[in-house]
Structures are given as structure tokens and as C-alpha cells.
């Protein structure tokens, strides 16, 4: 009798933890905008085709505003960008480190493909890979659309990406 009671209790706890884990995973889904500035080195592979390696960095603004997940957090993304203007195709990928005002960090990997022209859109996906502090154990994935507004003559770029919109 005591064994059955303990077994039921253990099953209840496991079920409760499973449900709360699912709810918590949903909490990591942010909706907002990341304004970025890209600095790096562009190499012309062939006329009209560039391969860029560098970093996109800026600030994330959560649509829910003050007190919401990652709102006004710093974002730094070491990355690569393959821009083929001849065929009007681009692809990119890398990692991002998201740091909030308290210094806690979340890490993710991302990839996208699209158009390299100014205003060109590149839909993609990201996956959380880990974190520190309150983001320890972060998991899940999301979608984003990266938009390059300007490819500057000095090899830098400016743009933004919308997350989960």
C-alpha cells in the first residue's frame, strides 16, 4: 500500500514537472525587433559575389515592452554572410549572445537565406543552445526575418530582424 502511494506521488510530481517544463519552454518565445550594425571583412569571391565574416550587434526590443524577456538586451552575433548579387541570393548563419542588464546571457545559433539587395528579406530560424543565470536551461527555437537596409562602401551594414512575427 505504501509503495503504491509513493509511486502515485512520484508519478504526480513527474507529470507536474513535465507540464511546468512545457509552459516554461513557451516563455522563451519572444516577439520583437533586433536593430543591428554589422562590422567585419568582406571578400569579393568573384565580381558581384561577396563573402563577409564579422559581427552583427545591437539591441533587442520585445514587443511586450518594459519587464519582458530580453527587452533592451544587448545582442552580439558573430556570423558569416554569403551575398551573391549576380543571382540575387544570400545566405547567412552564426551564433548570438544575448546579455540582459543583470549580466545573464542566453545563447543561440541561427541561419537564414534570402536576397542581398538593400531592403532584401532573409527568413530564417534560430535555436537556443544554452544560457547563464536565469537563462540556464533555456531551450526551444523560433523564426526571424533579417533585413539589410544598407550595405556601406566600407564593408559595414545596417539593418534589423523581426523575431517570431
Locate the predicted segments by residue:
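Bacterial N-terminal signal peptides
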Residues: 10-20
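Beta-strand-enriched cores of mature, soluble protein domains
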Residues: 24-165
Amino acid at each position: 500500500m505504501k509503495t503504491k502511494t509513493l509511486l502515485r506521488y512520484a508519478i504526480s510530481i513527474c507529470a507536474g514537472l513535465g507540464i511546468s517544463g512545457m509552459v516554461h519552454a513557451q516563455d522563451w518565445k519572444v516577439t520583437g525587433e533586433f536593430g543591428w550594425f554589422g562590422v567585419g571583412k568582406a571578400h569579393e569571391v568573384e565580381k558581384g559575389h561577396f563573402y563577409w565574416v564579422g559581427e552583427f550587434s545591437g539591441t533587442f526590443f520585445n514587443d511586450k515592452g518594459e519587464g519582458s524577456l530580453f527587452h533592451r538586451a544587448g545582442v552580439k552575433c558573430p556570423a558569416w554572410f554569403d551575398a551573391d548579387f549576380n543571382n540575387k541570393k544570400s545566405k547567412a548563419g552564426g551564433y548570438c549572445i544575448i546579455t540582459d542588464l543583470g549580466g545573464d546571457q542566453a545563447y543561440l545559433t541561427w541561419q537564414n537565406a534570402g536576397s542581398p539587395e538593400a531592403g532584401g528579406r532573409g527568413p530564417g530560424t534560430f535555436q537556443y543552445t544554452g544560457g547563464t543565470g536565469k537563462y540556464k536551461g533555456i531551450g526551444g527555437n523560433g523564426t526571424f526575418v533579417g533585413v539589410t537596409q544598407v550595405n556601406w562602401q566600407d564593408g559595414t551594414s545596417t539593418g534589423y530582424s523581426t523575431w517570431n512575427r
